[in-house]
Amino acid sequence: MQVQAAPFGQPGWLTMLDRVPESPIPMLGVAQFYARDIPEIPFPEGTDLLQVLWCPNEHDLEDTGLAPAPLLVWRRVTDVADVLAEPPMRDHTTPDGGTETPVADLSHEDYLPRPCVLHLERVTEYPDPEELPGHVQTALNAWEDSSEHSYQYLLSIAPGCKIGGWESWHVTDMYELPCDVCGTETEPLLKLASSEWDGGSESRWRPLEERHLEWGTPECEETLEPTTLQLGRHAALTIFLCPRSAEHGYRLTIQ
């Protein structure tokens, strides 16, 4: 899979202009999920494998502005044969036969995920306060004032990378994300986050088996930012799907 690399044209990236090739560079594998592990994913009929790829460079996307450009590939496991010994186009060669350059050297380092294994855990979370009826928001505000607890950190959106759940609207006000094909409101499919928790959510969402690790140590950093992705301003990118058909494309947010 390939996508045309977009040139950098924003202030702050001018030093990278010479690194971005005019010819295509390969899409990068970000994640893959099997229906046998996560049947909640709305796999199109006849598919049982979702592969998420993206171009590891900045693209001026309609939904988010500057971000990596994702591609969702729905496949059948039985169609996947032998694993390639060498990924296609590990090195980038220009159409005129120019010098080969490692693709990683032509990519935005914030969009190069560190390989890691998924350890699936199902949790229950509740909607962002903005998605709740007014009278419920009022009751929550009163509860927070009397208990000194935080609904957002203790009960609401689980931080970190996840499948499904609710979107957090802490950066922008909540807004609609209708399907571009049929107009149905889309729903969160996958969140890719810069970190798994933060100072506010640590007490609720930091895994118990990792709480002995001290802040600032390499061991702690590896659990806090296992993928090393940096999206937005240390934010998260969420891919939304149409509930009527996963083949209608996707919408994006960065929160």
What do the PLM-derived regions correspond to, one by one?
Residues 1-255:
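Preference for intrinsically disordered or flexible, low-complexity segments
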